Amino acid sequence: MNQMLAAWQGTVTPEMEQVARDEGYPVEPVLQGVAAGTIVIPANMRRKNLKAVGIGTGLRTKVNANIGTSPKQSALDDHRVKLRVALDAGADAVMDLSTGGDLDRCRREILASCPVPVGTVPIYQAAIEAKERYGAIVAMREDELFEVVERQAKDGVDFFTIHAGVTLESLDRLRKQGRLTDIVSRGGSFLTGWMLHNDRENPFYKEFDRLLEICLAYDVALSLGDGMRPGCQADATDRAQVQELLILGELVDRCREAGVQVFVEGPGHVPLDQIIMNVQLQKRLCKGAPFYVLGPLVTDVAPGYDHITAAIGGAVAAMAGADFLCYVTPAEHLGLPTVEDVREGVIATRIAGHAADLVKRVPGAREWDERMSRARKALDWEKQIELAIDPEKARRYHTERNPEKFAGCTMCGEFCAMKLVGEYLGKDYENC
């Protein structure tokens, strides 16, 4: 069932009920949000094993994990392990960004084994197939691009990243203004090369209605990609980025008119003092459409630690109203992430999202922290580990560093503040 069309008719779908249960909400606000386009439930009608996830206003901040093969590393076994680790770490959605090996097989395996929404970037496969077929990405034919879109929709992909805002107009803005890092979006660069070589408009923009027909038929949500996202602090919030956002705002209107669910992607690399303004600008220009941000990374000098730079920016962005955070791993800017990089990226991004949910008073967020505080007050280590966002790491640290199972920890030892104050105040440990 098409989620937005059902919501317009006042029909509550099983997916809406699932989202309401998971969020601790009555179903009516979810129904209203889907109808208005401020909540998106990516759920391809052909998916059989999907646990519906809601993204948008009033809901818990969601986290996406990117996985995928590359031309240098295309082993499916690694891919499967990374998927399992991302899910175990708590990812709410997964994107298959594969560019190496059998792309159809890789995607179909993920869809068959992944219970959460799965997204793709169709231009990747279209570009790679054009290179294999003709020897050059710029030789890609427009019909072949849309054939890939429909093939992936038929497979059950729940949302597409589509760089429809990379237009001849936005490229002209970029060329006139100049940029330090130009275009860092891979999908945006594929389309830019094709457009400039062929001197033609972006097919996704020119034939946007054709794209909407496919998405409507399978209820694939559109994630309007930010091909002009800044790739460094110096390029943040420049004319090219804002020009693309203006176009994306117009495309949001067209998606909603057609009954296609839509959310909007955002930067990128952004200084701390510009993040809130970027979120407010997107929400204003895109009429409350859910905002999906990559980071944003708040400095460019921390390769190896970009899961931290992204978590800092992600917390601020989500606090300001961003709804969906794409994880960044420690391997960002350095290479394909390992299994451990994937786990660390998901956990760091979940921490950022939860920190924002505390501010936004998302149901259950403050209660989680309060339960942890009570467990700490009671020196209840098992409960603390159970409540930790990463129980595995918490247990390992505690076991390794407190082998004698002292009531406190090895940081303070017998001078544990919780223990001492409890004794002086005559309080017993409280069970949480």
Curated annotation (Swiss-Prot):
Binds 1 [4Fe-4S] cluster per subunit. The cluster is coordinated with 3 cysteines and an exchangeable S-adenosyl-L-methionine. Substrate binds at residues 66, 95, 124, 163, 185-187, 226-229, 265, 292. It comes from the Bacteria. One of its GO terms (molecular function) is carbon-carbon lyase activity. Its cofactor is [4Fe-4S] cluster. Pathway: Cofactor biosynthesis; thiamine diphosphate biosynthesis. It is an enzyme of class 4 (lyase). The keyword 4Fe-4S applies. Its EC number is 4.1.99.17. It catalyses: 5-amino-1-(5-phospho-beta-D-ribosyl)imidazole + S-adenosyl-L-methionine = 4-amino-2-methyl-5-(phosphooxymethyl)pyrimidine + CO + 5'-deoxyadenosine + formate + L-methionine + 3 H(+). Zn(2+) binds at residues 269, 333. Pfam families: ThiC_Rad_SAM. Transmembrane segments: none annotated. Keywords: 4Fe-4S, Iron, Iron-sulfur, Lyase, Metal-binding, S-adenosyl-L-methionine, Thiamine biosynthesis, Zinc. InterPro entries: ThiC (IPR037509), ThiC/Bza_core_dom (IPR038521), ThiC/BzaA/B (IPR002817). NCBIfam families: PRK13352.1, thiC. PANTHER family: PHOSPHOMETHYLPYRIMIDINE SYNTHASE, CHLOROPLASTIC (PTHR30557:SF1), THIAMINE BIOSYNTHESIS PROTEIN THIC (PTHR30557). Belongs to the ThiC family. Catalyzes the synthesis of the hydroxymethylpyrimidine phosphate (HMP-P) moiety of thiamine from aminoimidazole ribotide (AIR) in a radical S-adenosyl-L-methionine (SAM)-dependent reaction. This is Phosphomethylpyrimidine synthase. It comes from Desulforudis audaxviator (strain MP104C).
